Amino acid sequence: MSKKATEFQRKAMSWMYRGKEIFKPLNTGWIDENVACVREWVANIFFYRKGDTTIMVDAGYNYDRLAEKMGWLGIDPKSIHHILITHQDTDHVGAVKADSPGLFRNAKLYIGEIENRYLIGEARRKVIYHLYKLPQVTIYNEKQLLHDGEVFDIDGVRIECFLVPGHTWGHMVYLVDEKYLFTGETLWFGADGGYSFISSLAEDNKLAGCAVTGGAGAETARTWAASIFHHRSHGMDGQFCLCVCPQRQELFTIQKTST
């Protein structure tokens, strides 16, 4: 994402959601002994550390101060060999784009097979005015394509993949070591409790409807999501996420992070 496009998106998104109290990123720092984050304006990049391995979750904007802030955490960009990508929006892949400073040129990207279709130009987002017409993203990193329900290992770190289409067709959520759920933009919290991000930016809201109406445990998930968000009208994202694997609801710890 070019610097000009980055600045446009940052300003446009801030204007669109003014008053919603929806952008509440965590400040740069360690959240616990395993998870840290870097704040980039209204977004977060997350890091999961286990032993000598540090895995990055999403790549944020094309952000000038990323290396500096990683230094605050004691993380050398050269030590990042694995990056989990939830989806290819330009505020999630900016640091691995071809026109980025190249901090992570040697890192392997893990991305859903469906979401990868955006990267290679097979799929495009709907255009609403101009804002949601995503530019073609060029990435040269090695990629491993993932599928719903896939479980794989990175240096002793267990990663389970859940496909949650709606925000994008191939949005992927990652459950790491059966303890940490990295949701990308599946769950947003606003001033009114929960915010239906799917209904505002979804390519096809029918996807969300299918997720919350079909399958065993769907009604339980709807009720559970409503209790989290307090307002049924704003609970779509929570219902969507929980219906991915309703029999394992105890694993879906809701954290107040925006991106």
Go through each PLM region and give its residues.
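Eukaryotic low-complexity, intrinsically disordered regulatory regions enriched
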Residues: 2-6, 10-13
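Metallo-beta-lactamase
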Residues: 14-18, 24-26, 30-31, 113-165, 169-257, ...
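Conserved beta-strand hairpin/beta-sheet module of binuclear metal-dependent hydrolase folds
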Residues: 21-73, 173-190
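Divalent metal-coordination and catalytic microenvironments
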Residues: 34, 48, 58, 87, ...
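Short catalytic-loop micro-motif centered on adjacent basic/acidic residues
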Residues: 55-58, 79-84, 161-163
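Active-site HxH/HxHxD metal-binding segment of metal-dependent hydrolases
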Residues: 63-65, 71-150, 251-257
